[in-house]
Amino acid sequence: MVPNDEPLDGANNVFCFAALADKQSGTIYTDATGALPAISLDGNQAYFVAYDYDSNYIFAEPIKSQKDESIIEGFETVFSELKSKGYKPQFNVTDNQAANSIKRYLATQDCKWQFVEPTNHRVNAAERAIQTFKNHFISGLCSTDRDWPIQLWDQLTDQAIITLNILRT
């Protein structure tokens, strides 16, 4: 509402704020982005994004599609990276995309899971991590030469992840 209590554009506006507080150690939030405008030369067309609550770290892994196999490859990469740094994911919050494959994979990793409803994006912190990563990644794309081939977008991933997480800490 504007200070004089008149609705903007003749409509009521509702502002919602959600805060994330997690007492459970080892929680990781995961989701996949939508398809990017160009398929990379390596065949990637989306990102698998994970947010680790304990380390406050955003992971982004290029994936070839939003099919089960690609999403599980993203999980494997993130889990191995976390384990190599001494973290063991114990609880995963994700949407129900590739639910059966995710359940099988998480069971092999001794990790519990929670699926959020498809319409409730506030519960999954990965949704906010996706927004943060995409904003940062797009700003990096804007710094490339105008003749740079957009099909190489996935080659910028490592640099984007490093700079994103340095700037956020």
Residue ranges and their predicted role:
Residues 121-169:
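Charged alpha-helix within mobile-element recombinases
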Residues 1-135:
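Retroviral integrase
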